[in-house]
Amino acid sequence: MSPEVIRNLGWDLMSGSANAAVLGILVLGVRWLLRRHLSPDWRLILSGLVLVRLVWPWEIPSPVSLFNVTAPLLPPINSGSFPVDGWRWCLAAWAAGVVVRFAWVIADWRQLQQRIVRSRPAQSGLAALWNEAIQGESEFLRRVPILQSSEVSGPCLAGLIQPCLLVPPDLSEQFSKREIRLIFLHEMAHLRRRDLWLNVLLEAVRTVHWFNPVVGWVLRRWREDREEACDVHALSADRGVSKVLYGQVLLKCLESAAGLKADRVGVAWQGDPSSAPPSLVHRIQAIARFRSGRRTWVVGACTLTAVALLGLTDQEPLPPRRVWLLKKESILGLLPPLPGFPTV
């Protein structure tokens, strides 16, 4: 590649990731401050602004841009501020990290596919409960098979083209029919939201920006908010369910999943065991605060608009420096008279 291409590629990657990191810090702060007032769906949309910023192709100068505040704090650098050899080494290190993380994700995917191959159809009773949970839903959901696998400790969705629901063989012994119905309602919400495909998007972003910790934090919070959104769907779909019962089912699933590694390509009902207990505490608190029909769209829409105006716009260009041109007579008039010399 030519030196100009190397410079531009390295600069676009670094500056785009840095801008997304600044916006990500803002989103994480807003998310923490307004957690009780924003629904999980609105928090997901806010986190999505960080992904939008990563691929944002336009420069929109604005006086309210967040980068008007951050730009003066940083040194004035551009693609030409570093030698070409430095950009080459940086891009080589970045590409090596992408390859390693991509191989890691592929290994997880192959392991999950092997679990699907080694699984067997579930009992007819579980299939009947699934059909009851998805009653009135689309044909796509009715075609999702339920498979039993001794290699999973809790319900887990897997597969992109032909998704399936993996459950442990003793699911009927661990949970009552009412509890299994709640689990199925939660998993149905993941299918309706196309979360398996969103997993691919999140992992692709994480792979490209593996060096950016802020992007990693935002995506981790995205997964937590996604689980809370599916909790809300399950509680809303079964109006007679007790919030205490739902929380107990969640705790039982997490207890059985303790010590297990989370899959990057599957969606488990208990969420990511590696992020517990903070994630568990947030989910339990959200379940306790759940109220059917609660509307948060006013707060969500206003917050989204404000964060978008701050984070999707760019720094205004600095005003040009004024150069004062003075006439010769004006300059001489400013000088004090010197003794022994005639004045003009």
Model-derived segments and spans:
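Hydrophobic topogenic segments
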Residues: M1-P336
